[in-house]
Design a protein with these regions (language model features):
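Chalcogenol-based redox active-site neighborhoods
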Residues: 2-19, 25-31, 37-261
Length: 261
């Protein structure tokens, strides 16, 4: 399914009319003077709904993930994603087949930190591909919002250079199945690392104002693959070429003596 001529204004109108953000959530309003419209960017407040605590940027409230996915199979999902410049039907099982996976959950399109992260991962995509890692961005925005954002020049806050797909989780089912749906109705800023068998190896959550580290994400994939290949475990600050440990007491003693003595 290919869409052309999707305007930024109509896309933002669509997302604002479809996102069921709770009560008085003032989501992401910064004036885009170049386009003479308001786009989403800064959360200012959320009133208490059904006993949920008030949220403000100063509190940095994060919804607790009730159950960890680490060590379990990643939930599979289908839907619409933006791939290059086309909107396509997406199947996670097909996309991540025989590959490691990085799911980059982010709050919303047209925001501050999110485009810097997505483009940061995108410019290092070759490093992920060399490790057989496929990257996918996920948010609750509409496919039309993704497309409008992708069509917007980077100098205007867009993500036009983006090289990996953006999945549209408008139903919130994907974010919910991963335990990453915030009370405000959008996803946590979170990274999910998956091995080739579809098992979740690492989940990281970040406050809305904190951007992720691409280098740290690559280091974690190196550690996952090293442990799989050798059967060894990776100690603190491990990176490729560093000493590792066998999972036994003698190896631990030797490592600690060499490293901290």
């Amino acid at each position: 399914m290919k869409l052309t001529g999707i305007s930024l204004i109509s896309s933002l109108s669509y997302i604002r009319n479809t996102l069921p953000l709770k009560n008085t959530l003032t989501a992401f309003h910064t004036l885009n003077t170049r386009n003479n419209l308001k786009s989403v960017n800064r959360i200012t407040s959320v009133k208490s709904v059904n006993g949920v605590r008030n949220y403000s940027t100063s509190e940095g409230l994060c919804n607790t993930v009730t159950s960890s996915l680490v060590g379990k199979l990643m939930p599979s999902f289908k839907g619409t994603a933006l791939l290059s410049d086309d909107l396509v039907q997406f199947n996670s099982s097909d996309y991540f087949k025989d590959s490691y996976g990085l799911l980059v959950f982010y709050p919303l399109d047209f925001t501050f930190v999110c485009p810097s992260e997505l483009l940061g991962f995108s410019e290092r995509l070759k490093d992920f591909e060399e490790r057989n890692v496929k990257v996918l961005g996920v948010s609750v925005d509409s496919p039309f919002s993704h497309k409008a954002w992708k069509e917007l020049d980077v100098r205007q806050g867009g993500v036009s250079p983006l090289k990996f797909p953006l999945f549209s989780d408008m139903t919130r089912e994907v974010s919910r199945s991963f335990g990453l749906l915030r009370d405000e109705g959008f996803s946590h800023r979170a990274s999910v690392l998956v091995d080739k068998a579809g098992v979740v190896k690492h989940v990281a959550l970040y406050d809305l104002g904190l951007g992720r580290s691409v280098d740290e994400t690559l280091r974690l994939f190196d550690a996952v693959q090293f442990a799989e290949k050798t059967g060894n475990v990776c100690p603190v600050n491990w990176k490729q070429g560093d000493q590792a440990m066998k999972p036994d007491s003698q190896s631990v003693k030797q490592y600690l003596s060499n490293r901290f003595n």
